[in-house]
Each structure stands twice: as structure tokens, then as C-alpha cells.
């Protein structure tokens, strides 16, 4: 649901700001999904620049490609590939961006080292991950599904939405990968939909792993669980009926 995803524009704008993108730059987006921050970066660097938007999901990239075409952006390429399997020549990019992706990777340290290699001298990395679960309101669906399926708590260190919610750990990983002048901070990401039902649709779109968890369950149970998820998002519903969630993301940046 792109309409709700557009609520993360502040998220994308922050990444572009941190990367200090200039007209004509070459940019790699790792985990670009429905097209952000790629499209924001493409507008910033202009037609002489180049953005390579990568994601593991061809379906999401198909939407991103349509959005780029609708916006008249001709400087974006799309590559469907796992973030840990990207292959580019060394020193191919002026900047690497990644929005809410790295925490899902089994080998974050190795991936950061490879991204460092893709950058030209003085090139910049700018990335975000989600903060701790209590300050990420869209995660209200997670404990509901875990309770209904009697899922055990994930073991420490396992990839997941909140696996990199420690800023100090992020800074350490970036420095170990070779990045200099590493800094971290936070940005508030707002997601809004017209109703709790629409918010559940949004979550199912952007977090397909939740649908996968329920995939083997009887249809009646799936419907019951999704209704409970919708009920959970009702706590964020305003008097106008709209659902408004505030979600803290942690950003970090560094240069080669």
C-alpha cells in the first residue's frame, strides 16, 4: 500500500540529507522495496545522476518501477537481488543508502564491508534501522501473531525487525567495516491510514513475513488473527477514524 508507505518520506529525506547527495552522483539503494529512498535520491541528483534500486522482492520492485515511470524519473535502475549477494565493481558509487533493511540480514558485518568496497573514496553510507520495539508502534501486530501461534521469543542475535536497535552496536559494526566519522541518531517515521483495516493491509504489504508465518494455518484462524491485529491498531485511531503511528528509526552514517 504505497499511500501509507509515503508517510515514510521524512525517512527517505533524512537518508538523502545524511548522504549529502550532489547533482550527478551515483547512488546504490540496498533494500529499496517500493522505491524509497531511491526515488527521493533520483530527484536530488538529477538526470545526470544514477540510482540503482535493489531489493530481494521482484514484486515490490515492479511497483517501484511504475512509481518511477509515473514520476518521469529516467535515472533509476532496478535490480532484484538479495542484499548479501550484490555484485558491483569496487568504487562504483558515491553513496550507499539503506532504509530499514540491514537488520534482516544474517551477515550484517560482511555486508557492510562489501558496501564499503562499492564506494568511491570519500563516498558515504547512510542507513536506518528500527529502534527498540516499544518505540515502534507499527509493531503492534507482532506480539498478537506471536501469542496466537505460541511462538517462542527469537534468540539473541537473530535477524529481525529490532535486531540492530542498539546505536552503539551499529556504530561499532560500521567502524569495523572501515567507515570513518561514524555518527548515529534517531528520526521519527509517521505512518497513517484511513482505518485500522487499511493499516493491517499496509502491514501485510510491507511485512510479508507475517503472512508467511500464518500461511500454514486454517483459513478461519488466519482471519481471526488478522482481525485481532486490526483491533490492536485501533488503539492508534483518532477521532476522525484515521490510524496514526509514530515509529522511531535509528540512523547511522559514515564515509570511506
State where each predicted segment sits.
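Conserved Class I S-adenosyl-L-methionine
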Residues: 5-9, 34-36, 158-256
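Conserved hydrophobic residues forming the short capping helix/wall of the S-adenosyl-L-methionine
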Residues: 45, 68, 145-146, 174, ...
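Class I SAM-dependent methyltransferase SAM/SAH-binding core
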Residues: 26-86, 95, 110
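A short SAM/SAH-binding and catalytic strip from SAM-dependent methyltransferases
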Residues: 94-109, 131
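Conserved class I S-adenosyl-L-methionine
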Residues: 124-151
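Conserved alpha-helix/loop element of class I SAM-dependent methyltransferases that forms part
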Residues: 6-25, 40
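A short glycine-rich, Lys/Arg-flanked "PGG" loop and its adjoining helix->strand segment in the class I
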Residues: 109-124
